[in-house]
């Protein structure tokens, strides 16, 4: 039940927010190969929200379900207690590009998960929402070199996100 409350409250607000998404000029990548996208991603940075407060070692794991939807397992270690937390969700692609997903931690509420930038070798990804309230930089590695991180910070700025709002994730 603690897991539900840790990740739950703000995920609900994410879903309510994205249900009323306004028109946006935010562009996603042209195409995502879901098979290559699956697996473990480590969070490098994010916009702060209560469902991830006090979290370190944040990662997301994506796997394909039998029904062709995506199983999402987000996890972290609480900094203050060193307690492991996780939250499970289901995602599906809204079109053939696979760059716009809908994710639900609490059905029937689904939130936007847009892939805004993706390395050709699937080593890093920028994920955001059309409302620009949510933003994540993820990597296949726990640590990202400064040169690449600076490149991605320039990219998020060009997309209209405020890089000063980013929280950098502790990865051990």
Predicted regions, residues:
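Low-complexity, intrinsically disordered short peptide segments enriched in small/polar/basic residues
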Residues: 6-7, 29
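A beta-rich soluble binding module of mature secreted/lumenal proteins
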Residues: 19-172
């Amino acid at each position: 039940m603690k897991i539900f409350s840790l990740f739950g409250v703000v995920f609900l607000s994410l879903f309510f927010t994205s249900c009323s998404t306004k028109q946006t000029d935010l562009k996603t990548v042209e195409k995502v190969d879901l098979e290559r996208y699956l697996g473990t991603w480590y969070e490098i940075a994010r916009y702060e929200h209560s469902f991830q407060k006090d979290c370190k070692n944040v990662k997301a794991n994506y796997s394909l379900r039998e029904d062709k939807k995506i199983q999402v397992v987000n996890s972290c270690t609480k900094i203050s207690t060193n307690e492991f937390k996780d939250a499970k969700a289901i995602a599906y692609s809204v079109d053939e590009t696979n760059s716009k997903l809908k994710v639900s931690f609490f059905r029937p509420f689904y939130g936007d998960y847009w892939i805004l930038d993706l390395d050709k070798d699937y080593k890093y990804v920028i994920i955001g929402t059309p409302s620009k309230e949510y933003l994540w930089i993820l990597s296949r590695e726990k640590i990202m070199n400064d040169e690449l991180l600076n490149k991605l910070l320039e990219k998020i700025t060009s997309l209209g996100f405020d890089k000063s709002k980013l929280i950098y994730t502790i990865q051990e």
